[in-house]
Amino acid sequence: KCLVDTFDRNFQFQVEHVSIAKQADVVMIAPASANVIGKLAHGIADDMLTTTIMACKCKKIISPAMNTNMYENPIVQDNLAILQHYGYEVIEPASGYLACGDTGAGKMPEPEMLLEYILREIAKEKDLTGQKVLVTAGPTQEAIDPVRYITNHSSGKMGYALAKAAMLRGAQVTLVSGPCAIEPPPFVKLVPIVTAKEMFDAVTSVSFEQDIIIKAAAVADYRPAKVFDDKVKKQEGQMSIELEKTDDILQYLGDNRVPGQFLCGFSMETQNMLGNSRAKLGKKHLDMVAANNLKVAGAGFQGDTNVLTLITQDEDVSLQLMSKEDAANIILDKILSIMKEREQ
């Protein structure tokens, strides 16, 4: 329903703009013209839109959209600063071809992006507010020469799902990611890396300030001892490449964990999943391991589903086949449950 008349008596509420304002969980003004921005900044409420927004006590998000010169006008910028002072969140406009024919800043972001702002506010209970969460995701690539590298089949989907789920639940999320072909989740700090060494450095540089660390990345265990400067040409006979171990990130985190920090690892196995994963739990001083078997249908790389077993010191919890998004939230539920038990 589109409301235009501020005092239309045909609706069930006599003062429609007030009743609508009371029902809102979040308000988004998109696109927001210079005129609307100016009115709101100076308390002018003379139509259905501005009176409704003035009556709202919920989160308010505004997406300016106008000609580049108008957007950059100091008066508009001052008005946006006033709105920010009063708690409005201002979305930076995109750049591109504008309705006036110019090209520049002032374009409204795509509706899908605007929806992400709304989902961040209302999609999930904010039970991770105040928590800093570090997630690792994706594969690493270890160069052989300028053309070839050693890697694995990880898509990063599980790690990205965990990062987004934690963000939607109110956490401050850092995502350290190897090369992935999927869009990173919004509102997280993305730290792109390529090699295992880069991931080790990125993770250990911020690990001490994290409340929760979930290491879902598939990091190479070995790398070439020597990286060739030029492409290795095909020759007669066999060729061998000497490999050396990479640093064990999870072992380092377990050995150097901060008091009260929760540490969750992942374990992809092809045999003896429970035994190998429980051994990892103990050896690396983890709180939980999310284990899966590559040979189980729906649990492998690249897919949108997973079949996990959550292994802790006290129990093994087997999950059914489900989307990686659902699995991410169950993992976070379990982490929060264990953390609350510790506090009692």
Where are the model-predicted features located?
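A cross-family phosphate/adenosyl-ligand binding-site feature
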Residues: 1-60, 67-156, 160-344
